[in-house]
Amino acid sequence: MMKKLPGFTQDYLPSKATTLPDKTRLERAVEPLCARHPGECGILALDNSLDAFAARYRLTEMAARTLDVQYYIWEDDMSGRLLFSVLLSAAKRGVHVRLLLDDNNTPGLDDTLRLLDSHPNIEVRLFNPFSFRTLRALGYLTDFARLNRRMHNKSYTADGVVTLVGGRNIGDAYFGAGEEPLFSDLDVMAIGPVVNDVANDFERYWRCSSVSTLQQVLSLSEQELTQRIELPESWYNDEITRRYLHKLETSRFMADLDRGTLPLIWAKTRLLSDDPSKGEGKAQRHSLLPLRLFDVMGSPTERIDIISAYFVPTRAGVAQLLNLVRKGVKIAILTNSLAANDVAVVHAGYARWRKKLLRYGVELYELKPTREHETVVHDRGLTGNSGSSLHAKTFSIDGSKVFIGSLNFDPRSTLLNTEMGFVIESETLATLIHKRFTQSQRDAAWQLRLDRWGRINWIDRQQEEEKVLKKEPATRFWQRVLVRLAAILPVEWLL
């Protein structure tokens, strides 16, 4: 059923947090640490999927004042439901919860979002909402220009003093919580000055003209308003959920978080985020995150390590990379193989540039989807998972600066979606990412090389002797044909 959307020009009054007479538990834990490191931020890279979920879950339990939560995808699965439940519990003890979701990935969540939004301490808003709630695809026929622009940002901020920013959405595939293939990903937990920047950025999006309150998009009946605000008990009661929660509670990360002994890296950290007006196509070109990113990071002189789930460099991007190679910069790129890519058509936008990049000396590595000798998913961190698909978005320059965030190296991230991330000045973190990258080159990825005839070979170096593969590994004929056909279509700007 067609529902008329509100105008996208309304200004919202800023939400007010619960007023507490004393400092919260998180504030008391964080402030002494930050006082010892003025001007720097405490950073913890979360490449383990269980730790990444534990951070969100426990910070929600610990929060006493506010929770500001912003995501592109929130799945209606075990991990998504657990976080909904713990957010509702926080609201019931007086925490003010603000939930900002991109509406492109909320099918099936309308009833749950209605229930949450009906609690006096929870506000739910949607970015670029769809007018058709059931047959959403119809919206693209009448409103493509707006609906094609999405909010890809991801942040989770507790009491204004701790934040989580990175590449993970909310869902079992990001947290190793179910039987689905695991997305290898990377988040950052941060304390210090950058948290205030994230809070202010959330406020920009919360108040922007692309965002509508849930009540403006979904009607709320009197019956729903008066019913008891409870989520189904079954969400906690099945055996798989109980086992997962037991793993959380007994994890070393959870113990370190509770004791305040997490191994933080202290470094200057800066938030970069797109202007929310990008969601309307009104952002100034100079404000686009990718253009600002390289100004902030500076020009590399030695090496760049790039890890990007979706790598579509475009003609202009290839020219920039090759210009760096000519200046003596070593460039290594890890992305998904066709077999590991969850969006096969995006692979076409990358595959067309592989030979040129290889000819000029760029190192290309493609993540394997599985390890043949393993039958279950094991989380080995950023790039070393079996049964996985790469979803991380990070790169480091000259072993001294690192970007971690939501930004993919593709036209969609550059021109259409809003993005965010941290620039972290840390040799320690850059070295860690380079080490993980180097480990993955042998264990979890194929290296691409050109043979004497200029054809691409995939080199498997997992065994003592190199194994040379002549075609896209672990793929079927129809997949390879589809990618070749997609490469012909003029859709690179959409990828």
Feature roles, as predicted:
Residues 1-152, 158-495:
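Charged, low-complexity intrinsically disordered terminal segments
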